[in-house]
């Protein structure tokens, strides 16, 4: 399994280009309607990125707890939130073994299930962790949507280049019991099968656009989106990461 603790720079960079803050606030206040203090738990929290989004906009008296397998990322999170210890806490734990000691109003994960071979079992655990009526939220990319969402203004760019590779990789991993690259797009159906109610689906709104003169940003873009450096002299770069936001009530 990938050691995300060694990829902190990548995580910080890509997370900065996932959400527009005003859209996340719209989800919290107008879609999920979090208008009273809540207890939030974040499965696979990394360095606490979702806490950075939640804390400025959730009602006073709310709390957030983050769980992650990486000791390095949890230490990073504790450093970031050292002044918010009353509202925020973090714990190192493997999600497969984690046993919550409380029930939560909001149970959330972001870009976690796609990396797990037992994503449905972890989703079941998330549901079990929610209070009756609690909200379960999964923000997950679909690899096919991600691949289709990249455009580079170059005559050498072929948007279908990775399609055959992704198909074979996906089939191989499914047959071997590996991770499901399509879990993001499947989640509303899986949630309903597992008994969640009031299923809703959104998509994140951020589009990563880089102009040809922004050389530092071009390097960042190529790294974030796994694009070959041969395209570094192209005329423009656009990527819509297309994270599917699925949610429902227990």
Predicted regions located by residue number:
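A short acidic, Gly/Pro-enriched loop at the edge of an enzyme's catalytic core
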Residues: 99-107
């Amino acid at each position: 399994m990938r050691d995300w603790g060694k990829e902190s720079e990548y995580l910080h960079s890509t997370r900065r280009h996932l959400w527009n803050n005003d859209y996340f606030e719209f989800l919290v206040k107008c879609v999920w309607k979090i208008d009273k203090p809540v207890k939030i738990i974040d499965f696979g929290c990394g360095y606490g990125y979702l806490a950075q989004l939640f804390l400025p906009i959730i009602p006073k008296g709310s709390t957030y707890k983050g769980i992650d397998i990486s000791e390095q990322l949890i230490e990073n999170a504790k450093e970031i939130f050292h002044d918010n210890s009353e509202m925020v806490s973090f714990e190192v734990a493997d999600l497969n073994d984690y046993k919550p000691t409380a029930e939560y109003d909001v149970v959330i994960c972001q870009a976690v299930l796609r990396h797990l071979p037992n994503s449905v079992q972890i989703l079941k655990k998330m549901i079990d962790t929610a209070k009756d009526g609690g909200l379960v939220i999964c923000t997950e990319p679909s690899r096919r949507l991600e691949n289709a969402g990249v455009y580079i203004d170059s005559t050498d760019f072929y948007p279908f280049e990775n399609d055959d590779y992704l198909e074979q990789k996906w089939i191989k991993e499914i047959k071997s019991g590996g991770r499901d690259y399509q879990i993001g797009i499947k989640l509303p159906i899986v949630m309903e099968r597992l008994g969640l109610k009031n299923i809703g689906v959104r998509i994140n709104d951020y589009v990563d656009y880089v102009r040809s003169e922004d050389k530092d940003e071009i390097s960042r873009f190529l790294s974030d989106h796994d694009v070959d450096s041969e395209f570094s002299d192209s005329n423009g770069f656009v990527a819509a990461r297309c994270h599917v936001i699925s949610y429902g009530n227990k």
